[in-house]
Amino acid sequence: MSAAPAPSPWQPAPMELRASSEQVDVWRCDLQRVGDEAGLLRWLSPLEQGRAEEYRVASKRREFIVGRSMMRLVLAKLTGREPLDVSFAYEPKGKPQLDASCNTGEITFNLSHSRGMIVMATAARRAVGIDVECVRGRLSFEKL
């Protein structure tokens, strides 16, 4: 008999999404739980689809496709738009932000991914940042 999985501290997304300046919402996606990413390509713009094709490593291409789809789907819900109608502007170093034309709620977001886990933070009228890193085994402090 196998042990039951531990309960998750993560809650399912509410039916209605609303960004708030009083809280930061964190979204996560475990790539192992995502089926074929080919179906997600429909949520990407032609430019994003082209970028996806440039990835030579399949796992990196998958992270990009799933991450961009997640970003578009969450932001579409928050802005009341269709996913493909969500448009982005880019900071000088390439960080995406919502284009002013579709960001009446002053929504901010940040996305990070590492080794099969994607996380996204959203809020309104405040800067947000998020980072996820895969920890590789334990360090032996004696060896340092």
Segments from the language model and where they lie:
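Core catalytic alpha/beta fold that binds nucleotide/phospho-ligands
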Residues: M1-L144
